[in-house]
């Protein structure tokens, strides 16, 4: 069935908006990496570096916060996929396996830490941004809780844990650790951080349980 004119226009709009987001993302991430604050970055500065006009920008985005939501969407999706990948196992990992998984997560998360920090910064004053940030990590929390509950039934996760509460601690401990510790660590430091986090999670979830 052929698309209607409205559907064609909507697809064109979405494609062009995505193109603009891809163009602006490296500009914003570079400014944030240089120590800038998203709150104080001016739209005009972003547009100048991205070679975009004001009219083009405001056709696709209501304001700078709506742009932030568009920029962060793919980032949160990448973070979510990386975070849940180690939990797809149906048996307990070894500490070395868990450490390797977390090292991969660090590599996915680290380039986007400035943008994620911007999301936290703006979330204090914008309820919609705050809701988006919390929902992004709520998905990770729910996946970890599901893994714990499944592992308890299968016998490879400790039975004395509260799945939802334990998952919440792991989720938000890791989120803060990524932004406060991993962001500034060199390669050797990141290795030690991955080893340390793996030890905490492994002892919390799997110690003393069957690995099969």
Give the location of each predicted region:
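Basic, helix-initiating cap at the start of DNA-binding domains
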Residues: 1-41, 45-49
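Hydrophobic alpha-helical connector segments
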Residues: 70, 84-111, 163, 167-170, ...
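Secondary-structure edge/capping motif, primarily at the C-terminal ends of alpha-helices
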Residues: 83-90, 116-123, 177, 181-185
């Amino acid at each position: 069935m052929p698309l209607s004119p409205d559907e064609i226009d909507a697809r064109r709009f979405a494609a062009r908006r995505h193109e603009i987001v891809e163009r602006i993302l490296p500009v914003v991430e570079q400014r944030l990496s240089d120590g800038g604050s998203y709150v104080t970055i001016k739209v005009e500065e972003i547009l100048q570096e991205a070679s975009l006009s004001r009219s083009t920008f405001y056709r696709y985005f209501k304001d700078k916060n709506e742009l932030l939501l568009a920029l962060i969407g793919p980032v949160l999706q990448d973070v979510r996929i990386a975070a849940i990948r180690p939990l797809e196992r149906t048996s307990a990992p070894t500490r070395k396996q868990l450490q390797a998984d977390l090292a991969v997560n660090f590599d996915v998360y680290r380039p986007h830490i400035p943008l994620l920090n911007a999301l936290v910064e703006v979330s204090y004053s914008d309820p919609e941004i705050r809701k988006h940030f919390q929902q992004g990590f709520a998905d990770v929390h729910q996946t970890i809780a599901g893994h714990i509950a499944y592992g308890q039934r299968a016998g490879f996760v400790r039975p004395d844990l509260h799945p939802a509460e334990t998952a919440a601690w792991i989720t938000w401990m890791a989120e803060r650790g990524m932004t406060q510790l991993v962001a500034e660590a060199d390669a050797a430091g990141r290795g030690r951080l991955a080893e340390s986090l793996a030890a905490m999670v492994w002892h919390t979830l799997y110690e003393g349980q069957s690995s099969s």
